[in-house]
């Protein structure tokens, strides 16, 4: 299967006349269509709600789009909670799924109406100390340990993950929480990452639904919701088939009716915390070829680097690359496509067969809409790029400006050296 950019070269040329590369570009049309499809796929469940994983793409303008389709926010830090509040999230719109959590963050999450999802049984004491009480609605994260298997092999290894409670711990936690005043409970689990199969959610649902039945029977706790979290992936490689959210939703419905409904639990709401699935394919990193180097290998240097997209350097992750305007030319040149960091792993592609690339060519690096800009950093003094939203009508706007040296040096603003650091700022613009 061929990966097609959601933007044309003509439109990119128009955008780059106003905004210099590199930048992250987002597709409003794709985001909306996908959010609508998710909502329709789970419309059978009256209480269904998607809590978008803010960590994946922390931009309020993009979150605003998802809110139009009923999405809330899944937060894991104080600043993500602040963003959720700023975009208008109300009580019940925020899921606080954190770990190793400072008490002040539990307090803030509760103050703004967030549902606290406990990662560990010891956090019961932390929450009670922070709030002076146990919230009436609370959730616990489950980790069954071992490996999580599916029809096409091992999906992931929860036993090695730092997250969640054991089976024994979650039963004890429910009993303790109930005795301390909790009235409605949720359970949460994240057992595999970036799964490209329609079977993952239904299989996870079976595990969670069966656990919910046992928890309600043995502890007397009322299960209000089951949070399937994230894990639905995207096809980074052209030969991968995308997940079908409608098939996934129907698969979860079938298990729901087989396990929960016969136990009188047909009122349990299904929650999700999708990030990559919601945004990944609808963002790309646009960069320009600025150098070519011919040594022991053929290198193309671009004006983006791992600061703009860390995944290839950090995980060896594959991101497809389109050389704009040369989509139909033969891929008969083998390149390493590199950034300028003083690290040899700053490579967007290694030994990648691509059309001949000339200096000045625009390259689109696909599927950066989640865990792209969000994982940026400032090593080597590099500055993070702008974010641009391409609207359905073809217009575009900046939704985050690029960093400047003033941003980079901002934490020195209380010292005399601050003005010296910026004395050449105007000359470098």
Labelled PLM ranges:
Residues 1-136, 172, 177-179, 183, ...:
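A charged N-terminal "starter" segment
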Residues 31, 55, 77, 109, ...:
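Conserved, mostly hydrophobic/aromatic
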Residues 58-61, 83, 102, 147-148, ...:
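Flexible loop/turn segments at secondary-structure boundaries
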Residues 63, 85-86, 106-108, 127-130, ...:
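Short acidic, glycine/serine/threonine-rich loops at helix termini
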Residues 72, 95, 115-117, 139-141, ...:
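Structured core elements
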Residues 132-147:
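Glycine-rich, aromatic-flanked loop segments that form ligand/cofactor-binding clefts
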Residues 144-291:
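Active-site loop/helix belt of alpha/beta enzymes
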Residues 260, 265-429:
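Charged (often Lys/Glu-rich) extended helix/loop segments that serve as interaction or gating elements
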């Amino acid at each position: 299967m061929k990966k097609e950019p959601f933007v044309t070269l003509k439109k990119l040329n128009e955008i780059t006349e106003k905004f210099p590369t590199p930048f992250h570009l987002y597709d409003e049309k794709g985001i909306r269509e996908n959010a609508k499809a998710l909502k329709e796929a789970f419309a059978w469940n009256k209480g269904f709600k998607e809590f978008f994983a803010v960590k994946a793409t922390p931009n309020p303008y993009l979150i605003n789009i998802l809110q139009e389709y009923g999405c809330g926010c899944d937060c894991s830090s104080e600043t993500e909670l602040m963003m959720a509040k700023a975009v208008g999230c109300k009580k019940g719109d925020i899921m606080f799924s954190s770990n190793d959590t400072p008490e002040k963050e539990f307090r803030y999450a509760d103050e703004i109406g967030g549902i606290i999802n406990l990662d560990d049984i010891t956090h019961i004491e932390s929450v009670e100390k922070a709030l002076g009480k146990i919230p009436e609605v609370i959730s616990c994260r489950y980790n069954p340990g071992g490996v999580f298997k599916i029809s096409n092999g091992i999906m992931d290894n929860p036993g090695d993950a730092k997250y969640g409670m054991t089976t024994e711990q979650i039963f004890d936690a429910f009993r303790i929480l109930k005795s301390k005043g909790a009235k409605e409970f949720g359970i949460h689990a994240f057992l595999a990452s970036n799964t490209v199969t329609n079977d993952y959610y239904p299989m996870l649902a079976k595990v969670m639904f069966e656990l919910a039945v046992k928890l309600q029977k043995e502890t007397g706790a009322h299960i209000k919701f089951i949070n399937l979290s994230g894990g639905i992936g995207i096809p980074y490689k052209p030969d991968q088939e995308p997940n079908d959210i409608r098939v996934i939703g129907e698969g979860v419905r079938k298990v729901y009716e087989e396990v929960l409904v016969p136990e009188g639990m047909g009122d349990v709401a299904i929650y999700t915390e999708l990030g990559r699935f919601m945004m990944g394919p609808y963002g790309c990193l646009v960069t320009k070829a600025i150098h070519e180097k011919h040594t022991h290998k053929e290198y193309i240097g671009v004006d983006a680097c791992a600061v703009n997209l860390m995944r290839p350097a950090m995980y060896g992750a594959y991101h497809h690359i389109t050389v704009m305007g040369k989509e139909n030319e033969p891929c008969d040149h083998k390149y390493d496509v590199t950034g300028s960091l003083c690290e040899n792993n700053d490579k967007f592609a290694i030994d990648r067969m691509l059309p001949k690339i000339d200096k000045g060519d625009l390259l689109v690096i696909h599927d950066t809409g989640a865990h792209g800009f969000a994982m940026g950093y400032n090593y080597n003094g590099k500055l993070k790029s702008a974010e641009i939203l391409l609207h359905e009508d073809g217009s575009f706007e900046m939704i985050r400006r690029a960093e400047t040296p003033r941003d980079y040096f901002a934490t020195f603003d209380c010292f005399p050296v601050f003005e010296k650091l910026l004395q050449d700022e105007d000359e470098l613009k």
